[in-house]
């Protein structure tokens, strides 16, 4: 039926391509005209386009000319000219869609077209890749095009930011790779101010979070999120969609409970009855716990709970789930997952220095620096017996889903997106357009071979590799885990077949190994998508063979002359071209998949390594009924029974029915994972709206020069709240006393002489006005004491500090809410509706807590800075006294005498000599005359606080030092204001019970 409708109505993708064809023809028509322009005339097109945009034309109006300009500039600078299909890809990207372009079709070159066009608006455009190397190489390779046309190009990495400058030579870069040598270091802000910025998804996201933790406007690096092209868009927006970016800080130290629970769960026995049988057939588990492999969840049986209660020595009559023991369930759950679900060399690896490093499920790459949250990483560390690192508290977090949806226009490109088009449309509002290849695809995708056991499958893989290796065809073997890649490597070694292994443990030479995987007789074992972004050239890459040819001549990259390098490169090129032709005659690259992935597009990515740009090639998947996908989602038992009865273990099945079964299993998993991600984004959207409100408030505080009135308004609201709380109709003296006690928590300068008696006889309105007048007077005095300029900074710092402190607590509370809210489903309530209701209530509390945090800390914060000012002024007063005190010796001559200090030099953080037990800065700093009396010594000068009031010179010094403090704050040398010795923690609005 669907095929009939497609024939009747036409394929929507073909319609879209036909619609774009006239634009391509217009660009081609402009080709000769632009080819006739001089370099200067072609370069001047950029200014012309900018002016036309300023005059009211749109990007669509100038698209044909802009694309023709880039095409000609690319031809003149890097010797590449965009094909028509690449022009189509560029138009699709400009329109904010996803362009599916097969491996080797030149996505890096395609991106130059929409990047140039959209950069003309002057708002900054981003090219997002999956790793630093691809970002730097891509920007450096295309850099000459942008530079020729007068655009600036920036690059950001984890520990580097730079601008493309052809006149700059990086002494530390490989001089043979021109893509890497012309990067001039710059600040991160400068890299973002470039017309075009290349970087990774992680760095763009983390910079956004860091910007929203900044305390000064000068610390911001990103501009408004305008336009981005996401390379490998399926990897970033789908595979990584549920992975949140988290900036964290240290929390409490890790508990010994992790090690204790790791030992306890080893004594538990897994049930042979599966989760599916428990749910669908009502069977009872025959062990202490059972595993739902589909959701990667673990459930304790009644027997298991009783066993744990015995092992934990919980007293009779009490339960593991009682409040006093409930905390342990969190550790038990993580210990069970670490022991029975997360496998070493599949989900993580342990480095030689004892660090647990996560392995990316989709790429097989190690991800150093990333940690599982919520205690899972600590549980795995306890399982492996390595050092357990402290838990962290989340300071800021965002998912890729929410970060990339903030761009005004978003586009993406990848080799495999069509199977996920529904998800791209529903979550990101992105349409997928399949771009035709420049040359016809002639790769042969052979039928799957399915074996009963894993052992039979791997034996068949070995036989196929031997056959291909004997005739000289290069082979790429794709695996789903480090463990599998090492198992195959061991088999190849025993068979005497030379090969390269590329997995999380051997990633250093990733690009080099993949680039040479197309040489004659090469055998490469790689985990999923390793080397993605690097083309496999049949015959090999001459750049990678350069060192080998130089070594034969007794030379190295460093010692060879340019002429020797050029000669060696020509030899390498000739060899790779000849070898490439031979490999093509043999049939090209043969790709072997050792297991089907949950997502069909991951399988397609592996197949896509062969047959690039019209080259010959082939692919085949070898499967077994013991593979995880079939075990979890396929009707294994029925098929296995048939195979055991009718087929020898070494004979594969190639039935079309099984192919449909496998594809059906993959479709079900894709649907399930889509639902999970959709469910995740529905919950995240609630948090995202709240994040946007908080971050917008932070930005307003950074942008606003004077927050005085806002702070006073917050204080007035808090006083009103205190009066409403304490002074109910017919209030008594005790109520007035409680009110004054509450007010002094905001403003401790209220004289002790002000008592309930002072306020007796006044109305509520008169009392409120009395306190407001006193508060405003105090505020004005504090402002004079620290100078108005510094007061503005104190206001900003206290407000930002309050937002950040309360936001961190809120993130923790929301995380707990999200974990527990799913229990609402058991009460026949929609968890999402309940989550929204509860989170809105908590968000109102958050706003109240932020306001009260500001109110209770603003005045104490001024004393913190004034104490610092007093210390500086005191030192200046003493220096003045030492230099200028004079006396007569009786002969009329003036004798200069040094002014002696009658009290010893005391550091601010030393204990005060008065014996109070407090630090000097919290006790007698500024009241040295009192301290001198206590120590039976007369002070040599009036106290610094008096000198500040009486001496114009020291008042000037205070203003100068205030300016210095302001400068230090702006440069990040002084920390944000937190609570102070005189300050008190603001009372929080109760959030309800925590788990």
Curated annotation (Swiss-Prot):
Residues reported in the UniProt entry to bind ATP: 86, 104-108, 535
GO BP annotations, alphabetical order: intracellular protein transmembrane transport; protein import; protein targeting; protein transport by the Sec complex
InterPro entries cross-referenced by the UniProt entry: Helicase_ATP-bd, Helicase_C-like, P-loop_NTPase, SEC_C_motif, SecA, SecA_CS, SecA_DEAD, SecA_motor_DEAD
Biased composition (Low complexity): 957-969
Keyword ATP-binding found: yes
Disordered: annotated segments: 883-911, 939-995
Localization: Cell membrane; Cytoplasm
Cofactor binding notes: May bind 1 zinc ion per subunit.
EC number(s) from the headed UniProt entry: 7.4.2.8
Coiled-coil ranges from the UniProt annotation: none
Membrane topology: Peripheral membrane protein
Family: Belongs to the SecA family.
Subunit composition and interactions: Monomer and homodimer. Part of the essential Sec protein translocation apparatus which comprises SecA, SecYEG and auxiliary proteins SecDF. Other proteins may also be involved.
Role played: Part of the Sec protein translocase complex. Interacts with the SecYEG preprotein conducting channel. Has a central role in coupling the hydrolysis of ATP to the transfer of proteins into and across the cell membrane, serving as an ATP-driven molecular motor driving the stepwise translocation of polypeptide chains across the membrane.
Name of the protein described by the UniProt record: Protein translocase subunit SecA
Organism: Chloroflexus aurantiacus (strain ATCC 29366 / DSM 635 / J-10-fl)
Lineage summary: Bacteria, Bacillati, Chloroflexota, Chloroflexia, Chloroflexales
């Amino acid at each position: 039926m669907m095929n009939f409708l497609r024939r009747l109505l036409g394929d929507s993708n073909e319609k879209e391509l036909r619609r774009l064809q006239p634009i391509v023809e217009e660009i081609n028509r402009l080709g000769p005209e632009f080819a006739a322009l001089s370099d200067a005339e072609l370069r001047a097109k950029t200014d012309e386009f900018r002016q036309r945009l300023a005059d009211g034309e749109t990007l669509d109006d100038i698209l044909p000319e802009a694309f023709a300009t880039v095409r000609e500039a690319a031809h003149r600078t890097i010797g590449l000219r965009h094909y028509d299909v690449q022009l189509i890809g560029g138009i699709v990207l400009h329109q904010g869609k996803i362009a599916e372009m097969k491996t080797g079709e030149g996505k890096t070159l395609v991106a130059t077209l929409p990047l140039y066009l959209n950069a003309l608006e002057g708002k900054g455009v981003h090219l997002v890749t999956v790793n630093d190397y691809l970002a730097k190489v891509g920007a450096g390779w295309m850099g000459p095009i942008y530079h020729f046309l007068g655009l600036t190009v920036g690059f950001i990495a984890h520990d580097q930011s730079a601008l493309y400058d052809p006149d700059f030579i990086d002494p530390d870069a490989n001089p043979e790779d021109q893509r890497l040598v012309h990067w001039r270091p710059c600040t991160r802000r400068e890299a973002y101010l470039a017309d075009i910025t290349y970087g990774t998804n992680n760095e763009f996201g983390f910079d956004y979070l860091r910007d929203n933790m900044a305390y000064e406007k000068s610390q911001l690096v990103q501009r408004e999120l305008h336009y981005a092209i996401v390379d490998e868009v399926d990897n970033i927006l789908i595979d990584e969609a549920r992975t949140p970016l988290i900036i964290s800080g240290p929390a409490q130290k890790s508990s010994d409970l992790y090690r204790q629970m790791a030992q306890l769960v080893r004594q538990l026995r897994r049930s042979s009855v599966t989760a599916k049988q428990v749910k669908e057939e009502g069977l009872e588990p025959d062990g202490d716990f059972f595993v739902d492999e589909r959701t990667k969840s673990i459930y304790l049986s009644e027997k298991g709970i009783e066993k744990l209660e015995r092992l934990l020595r919980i007293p009779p009559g009490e339960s593991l789930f009682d409040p006093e023991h409930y905390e342990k369930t969190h550790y038990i759950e993580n210990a069970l997952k670490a022991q029975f679900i997360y496998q070493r060399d599949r989900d993580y690896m342990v480095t030689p220095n004892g660090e647990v490093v996560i392995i990316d499920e989709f790429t097989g790459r190690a991800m150093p620096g990333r940690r599982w949250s919520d205690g899972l990483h600590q549980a795995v560390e306890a399982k492996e017996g390595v050092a357990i690192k402290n838990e962290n508290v989340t300071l800021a977090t965002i998912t890729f889903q929410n970060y990339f949806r903030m761009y005004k226009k978003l586009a993406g490109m990848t080799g495999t997106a069509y199977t996920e088009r529904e998800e791209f449309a529903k979550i990101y509002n992105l349409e997928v357009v399949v771009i035709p290849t420049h040359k016809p695809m002639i790769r042969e995708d052979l039928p799957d071979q399915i074996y009963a056991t894993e052992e039979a499958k791997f034996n068949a893989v070995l036989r196929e590799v031997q056959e291909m290796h004997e005739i000289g065809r290069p082979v790429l073997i794709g695996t789903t885990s480090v463990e599998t890649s090492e198992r195959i490597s061991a088999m190849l070694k025993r068979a005497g077949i030379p090969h390269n292994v590329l997995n999380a443990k051997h990633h250093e030479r990733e690009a080099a190994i993949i680039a040479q995987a197309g040489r004659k007789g090469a055998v490469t074992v790689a985990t999923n998508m390793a080397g993605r972004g690097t083309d496999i050239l049949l015959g090999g890459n001459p750049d990678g063979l350069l060192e080998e040819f130089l070594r034969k001549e007794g030379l190295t990259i460093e010692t060879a002359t340019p002429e020797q390098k050029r000669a060696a490169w020509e030899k390498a090129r000739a060899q790779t071209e000849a070898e490439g032709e031979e490999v093509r005659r043999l049939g090209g690259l043969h790709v072997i998949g050792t297991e089907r992935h949950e997502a069909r597009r991951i399988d397609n990515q592996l197949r896509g390594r062969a047959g690039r740009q019209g080259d010959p090639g082939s692919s085949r998947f070898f499967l077994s009924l013991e593979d995880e996908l079939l075990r979890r989602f396929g009707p294994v038992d029925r098929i296995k029974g048939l195979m055991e009865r009718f087929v020898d273990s070494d004979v594969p099945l190639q039935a079309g029915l099984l192919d449909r079964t496998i594809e059906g299993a993959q479709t079900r998993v894709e649907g399930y994972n889509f639902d999970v991600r959709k469910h995740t984004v529905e919950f995240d959207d609630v948090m995202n709206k709240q994040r946007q409100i908080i971050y917008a408030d932070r930005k307003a505080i950074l942008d606003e020069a004077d927050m005085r009135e806002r702070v006073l308004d917050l204080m007035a609201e808090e006083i009103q709240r205190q009066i409403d709380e304490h002074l109910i109709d017919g209030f008594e003296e005790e109520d007035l006393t409680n009110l004054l006690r509450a007010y002094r928590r905001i403003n401790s300068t209220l004289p002790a002489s002000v008592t309930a008696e002072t306020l007796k006889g006044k109305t509520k309105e008169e009392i409120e006005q009395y306190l407001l007048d006193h508060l405003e007077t105090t505020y004005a005095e504090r402002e004079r004491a620290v100078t108005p300029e510094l007061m503005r900074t104190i206001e900003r710092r206290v407000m930002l500090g309050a937002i950040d402190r309360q936001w961190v607590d809120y993130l923790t509370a929301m995380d707990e809410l999200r974990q527990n809210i799913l229990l609402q489903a058991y009460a026949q309530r929609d968890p999402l509706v309940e989550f929204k209701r509860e989170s809105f209530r908590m968000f109102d509390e958050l706003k109240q807590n932020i306001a009260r945090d500001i109110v209770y800390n603003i005045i104490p914060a001024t004393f913190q800075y004034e104490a610092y000012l007093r210390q500086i002024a005191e030192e200046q007063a003493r220096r003045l006294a030492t230099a200028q005190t004079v006396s007569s010796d009786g002969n009329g001559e003036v004798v200069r005498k040094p002014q002696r200090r009658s009290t010893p030099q005391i550091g601010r953080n030393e204990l005060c000599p008065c014996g109070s037990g407090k630090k000097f800065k919290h006790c007698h700093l500024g009241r040295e005359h009192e301290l001198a009396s206590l120590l039976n010594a007369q002070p040599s000068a009036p106290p610094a606080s008096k000198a500040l009031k009486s001496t114009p010179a020291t008042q000037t010094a205070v203003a100068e030092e205030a300016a210095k403090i302001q400068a230090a704050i702006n440069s990040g040398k002084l920390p944000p204001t937190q609570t102070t010795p005189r300050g008190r923690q603001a009372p929080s609005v109760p959030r309800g019970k925590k788990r």
